[in-house]
Design a protein with these regions (language model features):
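Flexible loop/turn segments at secondary-structure boundaries
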Residues: 100-101, 131, 195, 203-204, ...
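Mobile, glycine- and charge-enriched loop segments
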Residues: 356-370, 374-375, 399, 470-480
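A conserved beta-strand->alpha-helix junction
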Residues: 148, 153-158, 325-336, 433-451
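PRPP-dependent phosphoribosyltransferase catalytic core
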Residues: 177, 192-193, 228-234, 255, ...
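Secondary-structure transition/capping motifs at alpha-helix termini
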Residues: 144, 165-166, 297-301, 319-326, ...
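Short, glycine/charge-rich flexible loops or terminal/linker lids adjacent to PRPP-binding catalytic cores
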Residues: 322-367, 378, 405-411, 415
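Conserved short alpha-helical segments that host acidic/polar catalytic motifs at enzyme active sites
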Residues: 1-237, 242-300, 306, 394, ...
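Extended, hydrophobic alpha-helical segments in both membrane/secreted and soluble proteins
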Residues: 303, 310-317, 321, 325, ...
Length: 480
């Protein structure tokens, strides 16, 4: 058996990250939208914690004038009332971002604002496209001067170039989509239009909302709830939605039958109070727990979830198995992006700063611990150790997703295969490495049952069945 050193700094970061969240507003009554976008981004903060930004325009003002501000940090760190007051405009777009190592900088924050021969556009992007290198070289050859290292700027320049050949911005977006290979949900703002676009596979979510005389575009419905907007519908995979003062129009010419919506939105990324493509995220996680209880039963005294995403699945496991559900963990909500990672010899203490165990809840008991995933195994090992140190007699780990065996090329920060514990170890070996008494994963063939029979999702990180052929070199370092 190949033993993994769980204290190795190579395995220090053991969480999955969604890359971005996008949010846009067009208020037909002329009200400023910067504060509304701020609250929308606040609701999407879980999708990206490294940088954020807002860009706005006044549809009755000078046609090329776009005001924007972006910086590194959380939404409430970057923006204050004074900054928001300076962002005057009734149409706008916002963005929260997580990036991989090496690409985190203010220059790479979004929204991007691009001035070009036909005017100005602002753009927010969630996803990753696979032919960005080729398109970047092509655009550079024809005169594009790139200011960032992200593939989002490639899309912005591509739209600007296509705008030279068609009479409308939405037509340029549609033409650009025909050239982009990969995953993306976009919100594009011109001074008179707000445009939403979703790739033909529908990897990343995007939905439409309405409040009074304002229309919204958002990565998740939870942000619509936060700003008091009603959910209208999801943007369909391949669809381009254009919002103007005359209302909404849609182009579905790129829609296709075969879709590949990211299944991990339901397992982990999306907030539990969101609905994606008609399916409630909370319900899907309850279902995952119920399925685990049927496929991997165990005799135990208490079921606990690793906060926060493990809690609904733990409740579902309890409901199906009859084993009481309990709270074993106290989470420190003040440990965030700025938490200083300890030196290697102190690394074991880092989980204790984030989580503490209620000893009276687990002492002397057989515990079922539910978590959403195991990536490298480091976090699972430390949490199992915390439970046993608190007196748990047995710890049985149940995972509400299949085993991660392959990297993702579509906008999710899943490591390479050599860093995925399940790629090189059997279930029994992983069980020994993390110190659990047993381990069970949700089976791949149960994913459809988890989302109530829906199909058309991407499970490539579990199966290796990529809906788009992955690149021969790893291009995942610069995601939108």
């Amino acid at each position: 058996m190949n033993q993994i050193d769980i204290n190795d700094s190579h395995y220090a970061e053991d969480e999955l990250h969604e890359e971005c969240g996008v949010f846009g507003v067009y208020d037909f009554d002329g009200n400023d939208v910067s504060s509304t976008i701020y609250y929308g981004l606040f609701a999407l903060q879980h999708r990206g914690q490294e940088s954020c930004g807002i860009a706005v325009s006044d549809t009755e003002g000078p046609k090329g004038k776009v005001l924007s501000y972006k910086d590194m940090g959380l939404v409430n760190e970057v923006f204050n009332p004074e900054k928001l007051e300076k962002l005057n405009g009734n149409i706008g777009v916002g963005h929260v971002r997580y990036s991989t190592a090496g690409s985190s900088s203010r220059e790479n924050a979004q929204p991007l604002v691009l001035n070009y021969v036909k005017g100005t556009l602002g753009m927010a992007h969630n996803g990753n496209h696979l032919n960005a290198v080729e398109l970047r070289e092509e655009l550079s050859y024809t005169g594009a001067i790139f200011q960032t290292t992200i593939d989002s700027e490639v899309i912005a320049y591509l739209i600007a170039r296509e705008r030279l050949n068609v009479p409308t911005v939405e037509g340029a977006v549609l033409n650009a989509m025909k050239k982009i290979k990969g995953a993306y949900s976009l919100i594009v703002m011109s001074p008179r239009k707000l445009i939403g676009a979703r790739d033909p596979f529908g990897f990343k979510p995007l939905c439409i909302g309405k409040r009074d005389n304002a229309y919204f575009l958002s990565s998740e419905t939870c942000a619509l709830d936060t700003v008091g907007a009603e959910f209208v519908r999801d943007v369909e995979p391949g669809e381009v939605v254009t919002i103007t003062k005359d209302g909404i129009k849609s182009d579905k010419s790129l829609c296709q039958k075969n879709t590949a919506r990211c299944i991990f939105e339901y397992i982990y990324f999306a907030r539990p109070d969101s609905k994606i493509d008609g399916m409630g995220v909370y319900e899907s996680r309850i279902n995952a727990g119920r399925i685990l209880a049927k496929t991997h039963p165990v005799e135990a005294d208490i079921v606990v979830g690793v906060p926060e995403s493990g809690n609904p699945a733990a409740l579902g496991f309890s409901m199906e198995s009859g084993i009481p559900y309990g709270n074993a963990f106290i989470k420190n909500n003040y440990v965030g992006r700025t938490f200083i990672k300890p030196k290697q010899e102190q690394r074991e203490s880092s989980v204790k700063v984030k989580l503490n165990v209620l000893k009276e809840a687990v002492a002397g008991k057989r515990v079922v611990m539910i978590d959403d995933s195991i990536v490298r195994g480091t976090t699972s090992a430390r949490i199992v150790n915390l439970l046993k140190a608190a007196g748990a007699k047995e710890v049985h780990v149940r995972i509400s997703s299949p085993a991660f065996l392959h990297p993702c090329y579509f906008g999710t920060d899943i490591p390479s295969e050599d860093q995925l514990i399940a790629s090189g170890h059997s279930v029994d070996e992983i069980c020994e490495i993390i110190g659990a008494d047993s381990l069970g994963y949700l089976e791949v063939d149960k994913l459809s049952e988890m989302i109530c029979g829906q199909t058309g999702y991407c499970d490539a990180c579990f199966t290796g069945n990529y809906p788009i052929e992955p690149p021969k070199i790893d291009i995942r370092g610069e995601m939108g």
